């Protein structure tokens, strides 16, 4: 169509020129006419490469990144396919279906609190990105925060590349946790039993995150399972939203699960809980009991015919310009040098001059607690060191495909309702785990939004039965 338009415009232009010159001046000899000279140089345009990017929710930042990429790359057009319709869990199910049936998309965009790529990795549906890193001039293995990279490559390959992350961590008081490096079962149980107010974390969430970070298992010799259930018994069935921050400061709430994505969040929660606040992890867990939630993650479909072009888009987030314009760096960056700068910037204290000439610190935020207002100021060296240690010691990431979670949550209800003893409950959980030879590949049904403190975390997964049904359809 573009070629015909070009010829038509040239023809109109040539005829107009002839009319201006006069018909008597037309050369009827054997020389090549002007029109023939012009049309001889026309070359058909190369068709554009269309890349489909599958997303759930269509974040404005992603749309901006795609628009920026399309504007800078001739011949490549990325089109966003938003799988979200009536709810996120159905959207995730459709996305899994399209990937596993070979329909696409070329690029998958997600967060690890939305979906889990483990099933896709095991089925060979997504690319190992290590070879792409090895030949990239933009980002390499050495550029990524080491603890995060070790978690991302725990299975021997890199099947998703996030741009940012946040940390799940518990926060409590020194009187409940004497050593932040090890929140013991005895301390946690004493805290939930002796506190005047209910914790804000629910039973299901405590059991879920405890399983994810390796706080307990279904192994026969692992008695941590019973201890987690005993602690969960003291927790509310539903997550509590507490508006009275004084209860935290006064130690009347045992602990809470916090999502720390930058130094300001860290400093704010530490201030609310008071000078004796302690950031710690889940009892008995790996990596000091904390969890990575990777954000703005990208995976490449192994059946895509445009893998290099897809990688070029993913890579654009990690250029110097991309880090300044499209990467959501309000959360911790996955790039070590950018993270270092984020932490360093948080210690910069600004000042202002009062009307009487005094130089005063400018707070980074002010909040109300009780009937007073309190200020939070720039980070101190010990704050930055604490956050560095939290990041460096984290060894697991948010997952939703562990069968242990759903089984434990379901069976523990019998104990909570007084229908089974703790021994009977633990035995039932272990038996069900043992009955699942492919338990690692199975996923529990989860479609919940759990409110945690003053933020919400969405936790979704495709059900085991759905994946099994899909696997059956593939082989028909």
Show which residues each predicted segment covers.
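C-terminal motif of bacterial Sec signal peptides marking the signal peptidase cleavage site
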Residues: 21-22
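Conserved small/polar residues in nucleotide/adenosyl-binding loops
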Residues: 462-472
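Early extracytoplasmic/lumenal segment of secretory-pathway proteins
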Residues: 46-115, 246
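Mature extracytoplasmic/periplasmic domains
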Residues: 45, 296-399, 423
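Hinge/lid segment of periplasmic solute-binding proteins
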Residues: 111-169, 276-283
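Helix-loop-helix "hinge/cap" segment bordering the ligand-binding cleft or interdomain interface
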Residues: 130-136, 149-244, 302-308, 421
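Short helices/loops that flank or line small-molecule/ion binding pockets
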Residues: 89-104, 108, 118, 242-264, ...
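Extracytoplasmic/periplasmic substrate-binding proteins
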Residues: 235-312, 333
